[in-house]
Amino acid sequence: DARFEEYTAELFCKEVSANTVSLHYTLKAPEKYGIEATDATFGQFEREPEAVKAAAENMRQALLGFNYDDLNVQNKITYDILNYRLKLMKKSADYTMYEEPLGLVSGVQTQLPVVLSEYRFYDKEDVEVYLALVRQTEEYFEEIMIFEKKKAEMGLFMPDQAVETVIGQCRAFLEMGNGNYLYSTFADRVMELNTLTEKEKSDYIQENALAISDYVFPAYERMTEELEQLKGSGKNEKGLVYFPKGKEYYELLARQSTGSRRSVEELKDLTRRQINEDLTAMEQVLGLTTKEAKEAAAVITDKKAEQILEQLKEGSKTAFPEPPQ
């Protein structure tokens, strides 16, 4: 058990330190886990399936070196989870080019500014690391666009409608200009650091402003330009399943997301059952019959969005104070 726990601890340290952002968000004091300071990085954007397979196989072979029967209950659970995840990791390597870093909801273009704006500063070193990360934005975006161009060559690029949405998100970020929250949130966090002198705070705020204008904004501008050039490359507008082997990849994603070996159809059936059970429970709590619940739902769907919002606004007055004008 001790040897297995040492292995999992090493694996944890290796995985969590793969990129600076994950490390900082996970551990306040990495040195307590024996993790030494390294150069700031957003992590390697792995595009080679064989490299992913090799990494997964190496980790799994190390795992199989432990005698399962010798482990205690807790470690057996950890073993099973790791074994399951590593098998999926190896399978997913064949679908590396199906991944989409520029997702419409949680893509890099929308999440990176949020992640940076919430990056906590505990000391001066954190500020230095943060600024080093900001200066790597262009390089990071270049790696993503190399990946997207390769997807386009393979016929796996997003449709034009999605491209327009991503471009719109990039432009909206750029249009914030001097009012961009990466300026204000950085200044707020730096000003709260009592270990810095006033001059250091002022210097860091200026450094951040220069880094945003010299690295972040150009990265978004370049991405916008290159996405414009890739328009027309995406032929599939019907969804993931309509790509070659898209159905198999979707099934793999379902396994990764749920941790279940059930088929997609079985999961859909379970979801429908759960929805029906929840609706029945809600009807009982509200004292509604099934007919009354359906009639209430029909009334809502017949209304326009403005009417629904106005109704919610009126209904909230009894529970919330009036908003400022």
Where are these regions (language model features)?
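N-terminal maturation segment of proteins
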Residues: 1-325
